[in-house]
UniProtKB/Swiss-Prot annotation:
HAMAP family: HSV_MCP. The keyword Metal-binding does not apply. Belongs to the herpesviridae major capsid protein family. Homomultimer. Makes the hexons and eleven out of twelve pentons. Interacts with triplex proteins 1/TRX1 and 2/TRX2; adjacent capsomers are linked together in groups of three by triplexes, heterotrimeric complexes composed of one molecule of TRX1 and two molecules of TRX2. Interacts with scaffold protein; this interaction allows efficient MCP transport to the host nucleus. Interacts with capsid vertex component 2/CVC2. Interacts with the small capsomere-interacting protein/SCP. SUPFAM superfamilies: Major capsid protein VP5. Self-assembles to form an icosahedral capsid with a T=16 symmetry, about 200 nm in diameter, and consisting of 150 hexons and 12 pentons (total of 162 capsomers). Hexons form the edges and faces of the capsid and are each composed of six MCP molecules. In contrast, one penton is found at each of the 12 vertices. Eleven of the pentons are MCP pentamers, while the last vertex is occupied by the portal complex. GO terms for cellular component: host cell nucleus; T=16 icosahedral viral capsid. This is Major capsid protein. Keywords: Capsid protein, Host nucleus, T=16 icosahedral capsid protein, Virion.
């Protein structure tokens, strides 16, 4: 038979009636293909190859459509066969829609019918698959390699079978691919329910006309994201009606199709189907179990097709009205492509089925949602099972959570609804009144985990905490005005005595302070005032550990006494200690609460001690003669011992007169009294007070050791000195009587670059001065060291009288104990020794015979205090006026003071560089300047009625620090005008040659803390001592490890990923789906032939609105562990190292030891530093927690609702239409936060441009750790990310809110899912620029309630707090 001349015909198999037309077509198609393989008998392989291509294309076309028509997904589309689809370049379809009208009464214009013409693009797609036939199999199938044996015949059958299996696999891929492609097409045009449903409510005549409407819409979107996400998981157990309501909203929020088609999917009773709901198998099963009612289990599905006509170049007009297939004639002609003569051969059989309806009954789940009958379809198993293609309706949802750590609640919120609900151990204080340091929450498995301050060591115990160089460079580009230089300028004292220097300072004070300094105003502000948009100085509050201030530029500090007229600039100084954090950001209540915590189970002053010492500090009649005695003793142990009898009589007299203790303003005197007068020389009660006072100072010293981890010295200093500034030799006591602190300070080494100016010149020590050598008018750099008790040789080297611990205790006493009792009502004073020593020599002592006994009663004429001996201007008068009973023997001892005299009160200015714990290339040039008085005194309560004091006869004010700068004491300097006295009430009158506020170690916040505190003296001493703990990385590592609250809090940010199960709803006939002619391409290859099958597809939406919508219905599983893995910047970030190599190595070691993100092995020379891989994982991918330093006084309510971790709202969605508005919303703090208009921010250390948090997490600065890979904070701090997401949100609202207006046929409207709308169900935190609060608490008791299923009945208990879950996960984890 000559097959070359015979036309090829597709064999037509016998049609077997089976009651199901679709199944019949499928069976007949399979037989056709198999019969073709059986009939191949020829040597002409080319002929049969062409016949095979044609047959394969027809076969795939047929069964692809047949299988698809069995799916409920076919409800949503109109299938159209379009063989010429390959030739279409730019297809469009035109719709005409007539808008409905309402006839109205009244003076309304009469409406006319309106027609809208829409043009829509055809989107072209394709499906492809491939298989191969080996050369040997081709030979067997073609018969070229047959040898007539049974073996070759068997091999030929096996080859045909294998080919059939390959073709079946390809066919199966086209069947699955058709369903997958259409599902993705529907998803591409389906906006989330959380967007589509609110738009129907808030759209004003089809448009969002104003910013107000847009803001209202955004607020609603936020609410709907929280409520609608995972609605099935949340409510399927208890509130099933809410699930039904959400489903009804889903199927009713879409617009119907414009296709007026005769094809109708219906249930077995003939009710038309309105659409299809596609979801996962799990959600489908849960919906059918008690939530939705199954209306029917089968459906009548029409076998449909469409016809395409090409008219004009690149213009396609679709006849979208489906044509029902009435009989198998149409099946054969349009689906199998049979020739007419082949159809006539079966004419008799076909006529038997002419009356069969055009529908086929298939298995289906039909449910009623509201009043709409829909298919409920799950393609997960039918289409996607065992494939490597993910199911499109299983998605990912990224959520960012926020957890406040260490926030201190204001007094109004520190309450307990039932104080007895959580009671401490009997007899013990309630730890729930302490500032919180730990936060507890649940991980994905319901296990309780925690984060503490120690978890943040990897963030702040890093040298990036000290990197402010780039910040200075950036803010110096901005214009600044120097309103007041006082506090920001340091000079050396001018020539002359200290008294003259003080007078000159007050004469020129107004030049330095034309306005009120910023640092004094801030100390009196509330947190709301500091963070208000009207605070112009808020822009300089950028870092918790640095003060930024405007100062004179190009002036080397210390500068000239008269500040030069230069341009201003911005300077930065380390705050050094947490007590220097501004009071609004670290309030007095917090400091006192922390002090109370530290005082528990530690030494506390006896109430009698408190009363006696407090009374002395507040005694306005404190004997002036006591200050005279202090001055002549001037810290000399030798002189004290010589005057011991006189001192005893002074103490005893004052004790008996007032029941108060004398000399408590002088640490040296307290030490000597305890050492020499504590063995019965004084009344027992009085001795106990001095002893108790000293024990308290020593307890404060032990406090530092308790909060310091022992270790080897770093940079030549012990860790306790690196942890607390009072143990740092660089800081001198405010008053020194000898050179001991200076000598100990000199042992620090050159790294601290310490310098010392004594009266403006270099320092030099003098052993001691006797009366013959004294010069009260002496100036210069000489300091008297005091005469030692032993070894009196002026030629001997000058060595300290006491060990370094003496100086440490001295600083603790002056900086912690004295302010607690004085509350700012004390002042360091200069002494006029030129008048004191002559006064001492004026004592009148009656002559007594050799055999006479000295009288003890002042009534005796021989007693020195008898009225006949009270000569004016003598020392006797001072003792008499103070009612101090001294005898002759005691007064005779005063002659010993001339053997070791003081000449003057000398100002000392000491400077030092940062210690090894804070020294970097940036901070090494920053110097502190602290003033000290040598041979001065500390005067307690000012004696307004003492004439000698008012005239400045013996003492004059010389404040060295704001702690010792009572304005009332300026009355001892006659001649000051009223302006100076008034200014001193607002600004501490500390001369600029004693340092400046911003350059001092102890600054205004500490002084104001002592003044404003309402705590008792015990608590306040510990509170002040806590304020002197340093803010450097090494110091913080000690504090975190030992449980010390550092004075600031953290905002913890964590990002988790969840697998979601989504629901898609599509209206019936809402998509036109075109199928082109399948093409088979052969590619000869070595060893066989490759076949590539490609079929062009296209689709176009048939709606004038959104015809599909979807929602995240159920939570499948968390991918991440929702745990507590802290970030470690040593793994992700490179920055400036510490200057001291030992300090850098120490930090790396203590941070990385035990850290789960510690580096793996030694640091590689090349390549990336990777974390150590754990041996096992139990809870999933670890989610990293990042820490944003936050003021401890931040509004806790801010964290109870979704909020921006920066502390201020961001994103163009809040902005106006101006180009700069989006940037201003993020960074312009002169405007209120859009979410909280009364304040600019809740965290100035993170929300402002160039702030610490901004520099740490903003990818704009090209830091390798600030990336979306490592950092969950990246998306909130990087402006490009914020703007991109904000533009998505703005465009999303504009696109979705646009209505269909009357338009010409040239207008193209594509109702596709707006760009960025997927973020509503995939990444809402980036879209809204908000993180969600997670269920967390600082107290585990608040997470435990007596009722099953009830968590967090109370939101607070004293200082502890509970944050409720306000995220989309709320209600998804019942066990939590």
């Amino acid at each position: 038979m000559d097959r070359r001349s015979e036309a090829f015909k597709i064999p037509v198999p016998e049609v077997i009636p089976a009651g199901q037309i679709l199944s019949t077509i499928e069976v007949s198609s399979h037989r056709t293909l198999f019969d073709f393989f059986k009939q191949i008998r020829s040597d002409d392989n080319g002929l049969y190859a062409a016949q095979f291509d044609v047959l394969l294309g027809t076969y795939c076309n047929t069964l692809t459509l047949v299988r698809f028509l069995e799916l409920g997904l076919s409800v949503s589309c109109v299938c159209t066969k379009f063989p010429e689809l390959n030739y279409v370049n730019d297809g469009t379809i035109q719709f005409e829609v007539q808008q409905p009208m309402i006839a109205r009464d009244g003076p309304h214009p009469v409406d006319q019918p309106t027609h809208t013409y829409m043009m829509k693009h055809i989107e072209q797609r394709s499906l492809s698959a491939a298989f191969a036939i080996a050369a040997e199999a081709l030979g067997l199938i073609g018969g070229t390699t047959l040898d007539g044996t049974q073996i070759s015949s068997s091999l030929r059958v096996r080859a045909i079978q294998q080919l059939a299996r390959n073709v079946q696999t390809v066919l199966d891929s086209f069947e699955r691919g058709t369903a997958d492609q259409l599902l993705r097409v529907l998803l591409e045009k389906a906006p989330p329910l959380t967007l589509l449903a609110p738009l129907q409510i808030y759209r004003d005549e089809g448009r969002l006309a104003s910013r107000v409407n847009r803001a209202v819409l955004v607020s609603e979107l936020k609410r709907r994201v929280i409520e609608d996400t995972f609605f099935l998981t949340k409510h399927e157990r208890n509130r099933k009606e809410l699930v039904v309501a959400r489903l009804a909203e889903l199927v009713n929020c879409t617009a119907p199709s414009v296709a007026v088609t005769r094809m109708t999917h219906s249930d077995t009773k003939g009710r038309p189907v309105d659409g299809v709901v596609v979801t996962t198998a799990g959600v489908r099963q849960r919906l059918l179990q008690g939530i939705l009612t199954l209306e029917d289990m089968a459906a009548d599905v029409p076998v449909t097709y469409g016809e395409m006509m090409i008219t004009g170049t690149n213009l396609v007009t679709a006849l979208v009205m489906g044509k029902a297939v009435r009989n198998l004639d149409d099946v054969a002609h349009h689906l199998l492509g049979m020739q007419r003569d082949q159809v006539r051969a079966n004419e008799k059989l076909i006529k038997d089925y002419e009356d069969v309806p055009s529908t086929a009954r298939v298995r289906a789940d039909l449910v009623l949602v509201g009043d709409r009958l829909v298919f409920l379809e799950a393609l997960e198993k039918r289409v996607y099972q065992a494939t490597n293609v993910p199911y499109p309706l299983v998605g990912n949802l990224d959520l960012t959570f926020i957890i406040p750590l260490g926030i201190f609640k204001p007094a109004t919120d520190r309450y307990s609804r039932h104080a007895g609900s959580f009671t401490p151990t009997p007899g013990q204080p309630d730890p729930r009144t302490y500032p919180p340091q730990t936060v507890y929450f649940f991980n994905k498995d319901g296990n309780l985990v925690q984060l503490s301050f120690d978890s943040a060591a990897g963030t702040v115990c890093h040298s990036s905490f000290l990197d402010v160089d780039s910040v200075l460079v950036a803010i110096r580009r901005e214009p600044h005005e120097l309103h007041c230089a006082f506090g920001a300028y340091v000079t050396l004292p001018p020539a002359g005595t200290l008294l003259d220097q003080m007078r000159r300072f007050f004469e020129r004070w107004h030049m330095l302070m034309p306005a009120r300094p910023r640092w004094t105003a801030e100390a009196l502000m509330t947190i709301d005032q500091l963070l208000s948009p009207g605070n112009a100085n808020l822009r300089l509050e950028l870092h918790p550990a640095f003060d930024f201030f405007v100062a004179p530029a190009d002036v080397v500090i210390p500068g000239p006494f008269d500040m030069p007229n230069v341009m201003p600039t911005v300077m930065a100084m380390p705050r050094l200690i947490n007590g220097n954090i501004p009071l609004p950001l670290c309030p007095v209540e917090f400091r006192d609460s922390r002090g109370f915590e530290l005082s528990v189970d530690r030494h506390r002053l006896n109430p009698a001690t408190v009363l006696a010492v407090r009374g002395a500090f507040r005694d306005a009649n404190y004997p002036m003669v006591f200050y005279i005695l202090e001055a002549v003793i001037h810290g000399s142990e030798r002189t004290f011992c010589a005057l011991a009898r006189l001192i005893i009589q002074c103490i005893v007299s004052y004790w008996r007169n007032t029941h108060q203790v004398a000399f408590v303003n002088n640490f040296y005197m307290i030490m000597y009294i305890n050492a020499y007068l504590g063995n019965g020389e004084l009344p027992e009660e009085c001795t106990a007070i001095y002893r108790d006072l000293l024990e308290h100072v020593q307890a404060l010293r032990r406090l530092v050791a308790e909060y310091t981890v022992p270790g080897e010295a770093v940079g030549g200093q012990g860790h306790d000195a690196l942890n607390n500034v009072l143990l740092d030799p660089a800081l001198l006591p405010p008053l020194i009587w000898d050179c001991d602190p200076i000598l100990h300070r000199a042992d620090m080494g050159r790294a601290r670059a310490q310098e010392l100016w004594v009266d403006g010149v270099d320092y030099a020590a003098i052993p001691w001065v006797e009366m013959a050598e004294v010069n009260f008018g002496n100036t210069g750099g000489h300091l008297v060291h005091n005469r030692p008790i032993r070894g009196e040789n002026k030629r001997n080297p000058i060595v300290p009288h006491h060990d370094p611990e003496w100086s440490v205790l001295s600083k603790i006493y002056y900086y912690a104990v004295v302010p607690a009792f004085s509350r700012g009502n004390c002042c360091t004073m200069g002494v006029r020794y030129d008048r004191v020593y002559p006064l001492v020599q004026t004592v009148v002592i009656p002559d007594l015979g050799a055999e006479e006994i000295a009288p003890t009663s002042p009534s005796d004429p021989r007693h020195p205090l008898n009225p006949r001996h009270l000569v004016p201007n003598t020392l006797n008068i001072l003792f008499h006026n103070a009612r101090v009973a001294v005898d002759t023997d005691a007064l005779l001892l005063l002659q010993e003071v001339v053997t070791n005299m003081a000449e003057r009160t000398t100002p000392v200015l000491a400077t030092a560089a940062p210690d090894a714990g804070t020294a970097t290339a940036v901070t090494q040039e920053m110097r502190t300047f602290d003033g000290t008085l040598h041979h001065g005194i500390l005067m307690m309560a000012y004696q307004r009625n003492d004439e000698t004091l008012l005239e400045g006869t013996f003492f004059y004010p010389a404040p060295v620090n704001a702690l010792f700068a009572c304005p009332e004491h300026l009355g001892a300097l006659p001649g000051l005008n009223a302006e100076v006295l008034e200014a001193a009430r607002d600004v501490p009158p500390v001369p600029h040659f004693f340092g400046g506020n911003y350059y001092a170690t102890v600054r205004q916040p500490v002084a104001q803390h002592a003044v404003q505190s309402r705590a008792d003296e015990n608590t306040l001493t510990y509170a002040l001592m806590a304020g002197y703990f340093k803010l450097g990385p090494i110091a913080l590592s000690h504090q975190f490890a030992t449980g010390f609250h550092p004075g600031f809090a953290f905002t913890v940010v964590r990002q988790d990923r969840f697998l979601t199960e989504n629901i898609l709803f599509a209206e019936k006939a809402s998509e036109s789906y075109f199928m082109g002619q399948l093409q088979v391409n052969r590619h000869e290859a070595v060893g066989g032939v490759n076949f590539v099958l490609t079929q062009p597809r296209a689709n176009v939406d048939l709606g004038v609105g959104f015809t599909a919508a979807y929602a995240a219905a159920a939570l499948r599983t968390p991918v991440t562990d929702m745990g507590n893995l802290p970030q470690n910047l040593y793994l992700t970030r490179g920055t400036i190292p510490m200057l001291d190599g030992d300090a850098d190595a120490y930090l790396r070691r203590v941070v990385n030891t035990g850290n789960r993100l510690g580096p793996q092995g030694p640091r590689p020379i090349f390549g990336q530093l990777m974390p150590a891989t754990p041996a096992g994982v139990a809870h999933g991918q670890a989610a990293v927690c990042e820490f944003i330093v936050t003021p401890v006084s931040a509004d806790l309510n801010y964290f109870r609702r979704p909020c921006n971790p920066r502390g201020r709202s961001a994103g163009p969605v809040y902005a106006c239409d101006g180009e700069a508005d989006a940037v201003d919303v993020m960074y312009d703090h002169t405007q209120g936060d859009p979410a909280y208009p009364s304040r600019a921010t809740v965290n100035p250390w993170a929300s402002q441009r160039n702030s610490y948090g901004d520099r740490l997490y903003n990818g704009k600065y090209n830091l390798n750790g600030a990336s979306p890979v490592y950092s969950p904070c990246f998306r909130f701090f990087t402006p490009t990310e914020v703007e991109a997401k904000g533009r998505n949100m703005t465009q999303l609202i504009a696109d979705v809110g646009a209505s269909v207006a009357p338009s010409t046929s040239n207008t193209e409207i594509q109702f596709k899912r707006p760009h960025g709308s997927t973020d509503l169900v995939e990444d809402p935190c980036s879209l809204f620029q908000e993180a969600y609060p997670l269920l967390s608490s600082t107290d585990t008791a608040l997470l435990r309630t007596p009722h099953i299923g009830e968590i967090g009945a109370d939101e607070g208990h004293f200082a502890q707090y509970l944050i409720r879950d306000e995220s989309p996960l709320k209600g998804c984890f019942p066990r939590i």
